[in-house]
Amino acid sequence: MAITAQMVKELREKTGAGMMECKKALETSGGDFNKAIDILRQKGLATAQKKASREAKEGIITSYIHMDKIGVMLELNCETDFVARNEEFRQLAKDIAMQIAASNPQYIQREDIPQEVIEKEKEIYKSQIKGNKPPQVIEKIVEGKLEKFFEEMCLLDQPFIKEPEKKIKDLITEKVAKFGENIMVRRFVRFQVGQTQDE
């Protein structure tokens, strides 16, 4: 299948990847748009992993208020002031702040969850399993429930509210590939009217 300039343009707009990368991905996928996106995502992930070791000391603090009832403050870091001033980076920060307001994550990533919290969840899931099931089946069920728990509790594992087929970590990975810089959520805080500190 011939790869047209229009196809390359559309893929660039959708992924934010470079023109040559988009062309190569379309050629590799035989013109299949979704496969090309997957190829770019995989490459982006490789790029993100290489860049993750670099320190992100620049960035912005952004806030989002929803109906005067929910407020979020977020620090999103990058490596250079140039990227921090970029409109697309600022939009990413806004989108993540909106995500936090809507989905109320408790942690940034699963590695931040204390081990005792995970163990407690596993015990609860095991106690909910009815019948005499083999240990490996129980383990599979518990793992599945734990994945759901991570999706609920961890910002990076949550489906993006604007594009639910994409996770927040995918969204960040795409921008890492586009800007060629490490990007990370440093911290966030979420307030809700009437909510106590322990809730």
Swiss-Prot record:
GO cellular component terms attached to this protein's record: cytoplasm
Q: Which SUPFAM superfamilies match?
A: Elongation factor Ts (EF-Ts), dimerisation domain (SSF54713), UBA-like (SSF46934)
Which biological process terms from the Gene Ontology are attached to this UniProt entry? Answer: translational elongation
Q: Keywords of this protein's UniProt record, alphabetized?
A: Cytoplasm, Elongation factor, Protein biosynthesis
Segments of this protein annotated with the region Involved in Mg(2+) ion dislocation from EF-Tu: 80-83
HAMAP family xref list:
EF_Ts (MF_00050)
Q: Does the keyword Cytoplasm apply?
A: yes
Q: Which PANTHER family match?
A: ELONGATION FACTOR TS, ELONGATION FACTOR TS, MITOCHONDRIAL
Q: Which organism is it from?
A: Thermodesulfovibrio yellowstonii (strain ATCC 51303 / DSM 11347 / YP87)
Q: What is the lineage of its organism?
A: Bacteria, Pseudomonadati, Nitrospirota, Thermodesulfovibrionia, Thermodesulfovibrionales
Q: What does this protein do?
A: Associates with the EF-Tu.GDP complex and induces the exchange of GDP to GTP. It remains bound to the aminoacyl-tRNA.EF-Tu.GTP complex up to the GTP hydrolysis stage on the ribosome.
> Pfam families annotated for this entry?
EF_TS
Name this protein carries in UniProt: Elongation factor Ts
